[in-house]
Amino acid sequence: MCTIKVLHIIARMNVGGTARYVSEVVDAIPGSVLATGYVQGAEIEDSSVSAVKVIRIKHMGRKISPFNDLLALVEIYKVIREFQPDIVHTHTFKAGLLGRSLPGGQYKRIHTFHGHLFADQSFSTLAKEFITISEKLLANRCALLITVGAKVGEELRAQEIGLDQDWISIPPGVKALPHHEKSAARTELLLPHDAVLVGWMARMTSVKNPALLLEVAARLPEVNFVMAGGGDLLESIKASAPANVKVIGWSDAQYFWSAVDIAISTSDNEGMPIALIEAQLAGLPVIATDVGSNAEVVEDGQTGIVTSRSVDELVAAVAQLVADKALRSAMGAAGAERAQREFSMHQMISAHKEAYERVLATRR
């Protein structure tokens, strides 16, 4: 079969699971190229970008900006005209808005939802309405719509976006990170050696709700917590963290998950949380709020504990795992085995290849 030329478009490749998901697909499938903007502000670019061929879209950013977005559209049009892709594969809302708005073309369109913005409290009601209407219209221009988790797909279809036959789910393929001895990892990150550590790792933005972790920690002053990540809330979280919470900013995930004993997520909204899968592959039990596809990663009572966003429930879950080393060990082992089975790189890449072949065989 001839090489399928795929142009992937994403607004920015900031540190996180989405960037790694996209990079792995681009890197593994011949004929793939990545078009992306620049990471701005407090965030930094994911190191995975260095492994793939990148075309920079100078004026493409995450926020809506009519002037810059028009310039970005022109840039994207020029890239498409020069590259002549068989498929334009957009990722996340902003890139999907721009990449799917261009008229005509001989190429097929695919869009991947790595989550959605309907539960993001940083967006106004009007902004969410604009997003919903845009997604409904743009879905009609796609040959295929992909979600990274089944729950996310259900929530999008509930908004009447796309037709049932337009959707497939492709879970991420996640590689186990290099493992380090706990003592060495804690030395690397300047963490205490004699405590059970509860680790939180994410972007420090409102949708990840780091403030909820601080509420939990305040109720458990005898438990040690460590928070890793950067973002616009980093300084305020540092300033308000109680004494039993160490906020270390950006951290190498391989050392972080090797250093802690329990992983926790307090997000208000999620797609498919790759960081939690990495934590499971590191043999950690996971506590996660029941949002997005978290419950597809964490099997409640078997590989960790899934809770509501209630402080009381999160406190109880942390207290239970901190007090029970045998339970932590059993859940961690079960989580590692399940993550290896459910989130293989081979499965993710094969599913994308099949998706590309499928859309090229259709008329739409």
Regions found by a protein language model. Give the residues of each.
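Nucleotide-activated donor-binding/catalytic signature segment of Leloir-type glycosyltransferases, i.e.
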Residues: 237-251
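A conserved mid-protein helix/loop that constitutes part of the nucleotide-sugar donor-binding site
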Residues: 16-24, 196, 200-219, 232-235, ...
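Conserved acidic donor-binding segment of nucleotide-sugar-dependent glycosyltransferases
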Residues: 300-301, 305-312, 320-325
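A short helix/loop element that forms part of the nucleotide-sugar donor recognition site in Leloir-type
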Residues: 46, 178-191, 327
